[in-house]
């Protein structure tokens, strides 16, 4: 019903609806929840958003987002600087960090190549990656890109550009997840798992 909420509340709902995973109904529910919890949730959220606006920046080395530049990953002396893990997005970097999957450093491309979406090499930070790969201390580039058509296209493109760098280029293995049942896996995953089988 139009006019049920004032313009300020409607603006809040419209902005919340822009967030991934929130449609108009979910945004309306979220707005109502925030308003009901004004002191306990809305005020701290507004404060945290303002701090993020003021303090968060993109790392000029790897593309991570942090409150310092270079980021805490790039400046951590315990990290193995001979390894660069290439990811499409900061969310992928965070997922690898949560899993403690690597002790290397990162490079965030910003996306994957996607001609259908109009994303070309010039839209990614591939040139910066190639430059980093030529640093004398770098020994391995790990392509931690999604096993999608766009991810694989990006991996092949990057690999071709790194041919003259004196680095080993590897990619994540693909296949059966831990706890996965064969009957529930798609054909592409099963085929990749069979091709990349290892000694037991």
Swiss-Prot record:
Q: Which GO terms describe its biological process?
A: DNA recombination; DNA repair
Can you name this protein?
Answer: Recombination protein RecR
Instruction: Indicate the segments forming the Toprim domain, all copies.
Output: 82-177
Gene name of this polypeptide: recR
Q: Does the keyword DNA damage apply?
A: yes
Which organism is the protein's source? Rhodopseudomonas palustris (strain TIE-1)
Q: What biological function has been recorded for the protein in this entry?
A: May play a role in DNA repair. It seems to be involved in an RecBC-independent recombinational process of DNA repair. It may act with RecF and RecO.
Q: Which family does it belong to?
A: Belongs to the RecR family.
Q: Which cysteines are joined by disulfide bonds?
A: none
* InterPro entries recorded: DNA_Rcmb_RecR, Rcmb_RecR, Rcmb_RecR_Znf, TOPRIM_dom, TOPRIM_RecR
One MF annotation (Gene Ontology) recorded for this entry: zinc ion binding
The UniProt keywords, alphabetically, are: DNA damage, DNA recombination, DNA repair, Metal-binding, Zinc, Zinc-finger
Zinc finger residue ranges, C4-type? 59-74
